[in-house]
Amino acid sequence: MQGQWQFDTLYHKVPPFSFTSQTGASFSQKELQGKVFVANFFYTSCQGICKQVSTQLARVHDAFRLQPDVRLVSFTVNPEQDQVPQLKEYSDSFRADPSRWIFLTGPKPQIQALAAQGFKLPVVAAAGDSAELELHKQLMLVDKQKRIRGIYDGTSAKEIDRLITEINVLLSEYETDHGK
């Protein structure tokens, strides 16, 4: 087409969601309108990989603490255990600003569907034939149009450095391209 920019990359879009945050308030994707966000899946009683990933996410949180267009969104994969008090305690342990780093819980089937269809993470059958989200260390960078723009190893300091750089690049693109 003449005179129109054409993109050669197709990004997967994250579907709408609505869950309960660590403050007890309802939180939906609508509240991320105009925001870049980093998503991950975890559970509060996980002592291994989840703590490593959350510690690295705390670096991202601190790097963008004053940036109004960046959020972190952590979805529990164990909503039966991770209710509002547990999410609040967990978020407090990382000194998370609840307006910037949102921890979410909700019905397990909805969280599993969001992980599997929304973020394209594998859901595997666990003992007892119940579908469980296989925990992954990936962090997903999602742009203002809700497109997944990158996947990062949440246990790697080097990958977190790359994530921070790519968030800054994305924000710079918005300032340049969209006259923000």
Whereabouts are the PLM-identified features?
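N-terminal targeting signals for export/organelle localization
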Residues: 1-16, 179-180
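Short, small/polar residue-rich loop motifs at catalytic or cofactor-binding pockets
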Residues: 12-14, 36, 134-136
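Hydrophobic beta-strand positions
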Residues: 18-19, 141
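Short active-site neighborhood of thiol/selenol oxidoreductases, capturing the structured segment around
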Residues: 27-57, 72-73
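Thiol-based oxidoreductase modules, predominantly thioredoxin-like and allied folds used
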Residues: 68-83, 99-111
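Short, internal strand/loop/helix patches
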Residues: 88-136
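Thiol-/selenol-based redox modules, centered on thioredoxin-like
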Residues: 127-180
